[in-house]
Amino acid sequence: MDWLIGITGLPYDVLVLMLLCVAGAFAGFVDSIVGGGGLISVPAMLLTNLPPSVALGSNKLSSIFGAGSASVTFLRNGMVDFSLVRKLLPFTFIGSMVGTVAVVSLPPFYVKPIIIALLVGVTLFVVFKRNWGEVNRTSQVMGRALHICMAFALGIGIYDGFIGPGTGTFLIMGFIFTGFDFLHASANAKILNFTSNLASLIVFFYLGHVQVYYGLAAAVGQVIGAYIGSQLAIMKGSSLVRVVFLSVTTVMLIKLVFDYITNL
């Protein structure tokens, strides 16, 4: 980052805050449409030389603003099935807290192959089944289907607290399998993602693992990016969300495979 300081003449702290804001805007834009914004925002936080746990905690602070901005936009436009989402919120909240504080028996190294396999399967399914997620076919979710959704919400909450990036993408997958189109699945997912971020942030604050200034700098960008992204998703509909979804899952796959291979 020294070369940027030389070019701009800006103090280090000011430059870091500006870069986090820009990274937050890109992350918020992508995350508001299909999730996966953490693939941008977490590395940006790590570049500031924060300890990993503090980088994750600071990222949660910024992410909650981005998720909140997108959630408000989707709610105002009637895109959220709140009758279903409100039943899932407690499970996501509890799961995220558990994932953040628990000593998990399986370290991330062993969990990543499972995630890679899931992403490969769903990505190929979306590519070859072109009409999947294009039409909103959902009806009232109840009985066994509701119980499955609750278990899924709990599991994704744990995943968000334990690993993080890609949570929104997996939530969208779950809602599409329930019968929602890409757009409504993205809207529902954003509400749960906001909830899991809030739960995880509470724990990180309690542990003192949040750099507030860095988190708020990225949050400014997150709010702007999330607003633009959610508005664009509503304007363009499921076809846009599908394209961005495939792009993000492909990038996630490449990164996860690379990280897994380099850690062998």
Where do the language-model regions lie?
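Selected transmembrane alpha-helices and immediately adjacent juxtamembrane segments
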Residues: 2-51, 136-186, 216
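Residues within membrane-spanning alpha-helices of integral membrane proteins
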Residues: 17, 60, 115-119, 123, ...
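Residue-level signature of the transmembrane alpha-helical core
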Residues: 21, 25, 29, 60, ...
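Membrane-interface alpha-helices at helix entry/exit sites of multi-pass transporters
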Residues: 50-59, 83-87, 179-190
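Selective hydrophobic functional segments
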Residues: 57-113, 117, 197-247
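Transmembrane helix exit motif
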Residues: 68-79, 116-141, 251-264
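Hydrophobic alpha-helical transmembrane segments in multi-pass integral membrane proteins
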Residues: 155-165, 200, 205, 253-264
